[in-house]
Design a protein with these regions (language model features):
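Soluble, non-membrane globular domain cores that form compact, hydrophobic packing
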Residues: 2-102, 108-188
């Protein structure tokens, strides 16, 4: 009788441990309504979804996959020193580089804090990387393992950023930056 009780207790403890393990794994996975990103091209597909219905209001854009192993391209595109924490990156920018607009989507590697990457990108990206123009507004956030950063003028950046938030459903902390315009001298 004593053996049966001990076996029953051991089995109950094993079942509880398994249930707790499953609950922990489910709660640890990133929460997002976005479709799983399995390859870099999936980021391009997401960008196209974000642009639906907004094409007439945006400049002519070109979406490219950025090689996460190319530190120079990563620095220019994201502001990050390297792509060590990134699995995939896609960038959408105008065909004419004198128009200040950039949308960056990045999938972070497993175990990397996407919100922290969004914050770092928002702090380090060059909002004046274009010829004679700069981004007036910058928005960045994350959803699950996807980072979104868009910078441009308010009229172009805000609707695209809002569409990402709508598609994602749940997002992490939001980071914004407004370009301070230089003060012009008074007319003589």
């Amino acid at each position: 009788m004593k053996k049966k009780v001990i076996i029953g207790v051991v089995i109950a403890l094993i079942v509880i441990a398994i249930i707790l393990g499953i609950v922990f794994m489910v709660n640890k996975s990133p929460k997002t309504n976005l479709a799983p990103i399995e390859k870099a091209e999936d980021l391009s597909t997401l960008i196209n979804e974000m642009y639906k219905g907004k094409e007439e209001n945006l400049p002519r854009l070109n979406t490219q996959i950025v090689d996460v192993n190319d530190a120079n391209a990563i620095k220019y595109s994201t502001g990050l020193e390297n792509g060590n924490d990134l699995q995939f990156v896609a960038v959408s920018e105008p065909m004419m580089s004198s128009q200040a607009y950039s949308l960056i989507l990045a999938k972070v590697k497993d175990g990397v804090d996407a919100s922290n990457i969004a914050k770092t990108m928002s702090e380090q990206i060059d909002t004046r990387k274009w010829i004679c123009v700069s981004a007036e507004k910058l928005y960045a956030t994350s959803s699950g393992d996807i980072v979104c950063l868009v910078m441009s003028n308010e009229e172009w950046a805000k609707p695209v950023y809002d569409e990402f938030k709508k598609l994602a459903g749940q997002i992490g902390e939001e980071y914004t930056k407004t370009e301070e315009l230089p003060e012009l001298p008074e007319e003589l």
